[in-house]
């Protein structure tokens, strides 16, 4: 799963790596969303995911990785339960200008005992914090990876997914990592 707050780059992340044209369920943002959906520094954002994004990567003939992106607005969180069922893990995308938007996302995956990693998608006009500052702000254990990722760049997204798969293996091999610290 690829998750995070509203407008952090989840759709872009999936689009950068998917070997198929990603399935996106975007709708135009309207005046009704003013005050509910805050695009922050992304004032140019005109569409939003309303159900899910879907992409696919074939790792080899017998292993295909399916990517499901969650909608970022709180009013669509009820859809997440269907998406998390059977998920190996989650990439939680963070925008440093709105770190607080990822707290409910962290809680969700911790409550569902889903291994996850944190990736900071750097926006040009967002405040810069080093990864240790992000870890501290989120109250994360040392064994949870916090990485930089450019959601537009295929290699950056690929490295992120490798880190997620490593975290999934760690989670399965060491039960203590299943406990929230």
Protein language model regions, located:
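Inter-motif core of Ras-like GTPase G domains
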Residues: 73-97, 107-112
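Short secondary-structure boundary/capping elements
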Residues: 49, 71-76, 97-101, 129
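Conserved C-terminal guanine-recognition region of P-loop GTPase G domains, centered on the G4
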Residues: 93-143
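Conserved G1/Walker A P-loop phosphate-binding module
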Residues: 1-42, 56-66
């Amino acid at each position: 799963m690829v998750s995070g707050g509203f407008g952090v780059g989840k759709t872009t992340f999936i689009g950068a790596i998917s070997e198929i044209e990603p399935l996106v369920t975007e709708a135009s943002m309207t005046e009704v969303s003013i005050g509910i959906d805050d695009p922050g520094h992304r004032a140019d954002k005109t569409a939003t995911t309303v159900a899910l994004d879907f992409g696919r990567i074939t790792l080899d003939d017998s292993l295909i990785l399916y990517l499901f992106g969650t909608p970022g607005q709180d009013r669509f969180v009820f859809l997440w339960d269907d998406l998390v069922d059977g998920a190996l893990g989650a990439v939680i995308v963070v925008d440093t200008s709105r770190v607080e938007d990822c707290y409910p996302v962290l809680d969700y995956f911790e409550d569902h005992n889903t291994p996850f990693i944190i990736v900071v998608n750097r926006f040009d006009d967002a405040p810069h914090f080093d990864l240790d500052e992000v870890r501290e702000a989120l109250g994360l254990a040392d064994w949870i990876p916090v990485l930089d990722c450019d959601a537009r760049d295929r290699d950056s997204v690929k490295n992120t997914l490798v880190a997620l798969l490593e975290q999934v293996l760690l989670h399965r091999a060491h039960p203590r990592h299943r406990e929230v610290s």
